[in-house]
Amino acid sequence: MTLLQLVREHWVHILVPMGFAFGYYLDRKDDEKLTAFRNKSMLFQRELRPNEEVTWK
C-alpha cells in the first residue's frame, strides 16, 4: 500500500485531528490576545476587595 493510497482512503482520519489541533491553537492565541486586552482595560483596573473573586476566568 503506497502513501498516496493510504492518504486517499483515510483522509478523514488525518484531517479531523489536524483541524481540531489547529482550532485549539487558534483558540489559545485568541485567549492570550483577550487576556492582554483585559489587563489593560479600565474596567478591570480597580483593586479587588478582600475575598472578591475575579470576574474573568
Swiss-Prot record:
Cellular component GO terms held in the UniProt record: mitochondrial inner membrane; nuclear speck; respiratory chain complex I
Subcellular location: Mitochondrion inner membrane
Spans through the membrane: 10-26
Family matches, as InterPro entries: NDUB1 (IPR012575)
Superkingdom field: Eukaryota
Coiled-coil zones: none
Membrane topology: Single-pass membrane protein
Family named by the database record: Belongs to the complex I NDUFB1 subunit family.
Protein name: NADH dehydrogenase [ubiquinone] 1 beta subcomplex subunit 1
Organism whose genome encodes this protein: Rattus norvegicus
Encoding gene, per UniProt annotation: Ndufb1
